[in-house]
Amino acid sequence: MANDLFAFVGTYTRLGSEGIYTLKMNGNTGELEQVSLATGIENPSFVALDPSNEHLYAVCEVGDQDGSGACAAFSINQATGDLTPINQQSTGGPGPCHLMVDGSDSLVIATNYAGGSVAVLPINDDGSLGERTEFIQHEGSSINPQRQEKAHAHSVNIDESNTHAYVCDLGMDKVFIYDIDHENGKLNPSQQPSVDEVAGQGPRHFTFHPSGKLVYVLNELGCTITAYHLSANGGLSPIETVGTLPDDWEGDNTTAD
């Protein structure tokens, strides 16, 4: 039916799931039905579509401190939602957990959580991924000895102008700002290279306000959200930080998305 939509669900195969699940949502009733499963990929914990919705890209969240993970490319059958694997490329670091496709459909930018690094992979005309054109290693730590003993790049977001990439590093309590060089597949430190979060907050995810003038950073360890002004040159100025838990909360908690 014309009102039917497809949803793609990434999973951890090490926890018993089998890969990337395609669900069909009935546009009239909202009911979900599993229609296919793409196997042969390990821990596709995060997935993203290209601007045309013709290809899907997934992280392969594998690799210990000495190994490296990968990103995988799939083509999408527009009629059935089936995923056909195209190829995989290494991200150069362990534990890739997040990725984004840029607005020109030319680059995938991925973050390696365990490795504390950022990788850029070019997208070829057929949707396949090329070898890395950029690898940036973050160096640093913060005050939580269990979770912030080193850099942990947790997510990447790209602004509407397709010129800046923002990387939340949970381990360093920083949001890094990069200018995107689309022609060469590079990331260059922006005019404001980074912004510091309050020590121990652990920035995890990042989202833009529809106005394009504000952004919000979700802090996993502090269970807070920090609001920033977004300037025309891509810089960030803090406004306020608010909690996500009741004032009298005394238990352990972390925020996710």
Enumerate the language-model features and the residues they cover:
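Asp-box/WD-like beta-propeller blade repeats and closely related beta-sheet repeat scaffolds
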Residues: 81-155
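Short loop/turn segments immediately following beta-strands, especially the blade-tip
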Residues: 23-30, 74-82, 120-130, 178-187, ...
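Beta-rich, blade/repeat-based domains predominating
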Residues: 41-52, 92-105, 139-162, 197-214, ...
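Beta-propeller fold detector
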Residues: 32-39, 83-90, 130-140, 187-195, ...
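Short glycine/acidic-enriched loop and turn motifs that connect beta-strands
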Residues: 13-16, 61-66, 114-117, 172-174, ...
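Loop-centered beta-sheet repeat module
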Residues: 162-223
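Blade-loop segments of beta-propeller domains
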Residues: 34-105
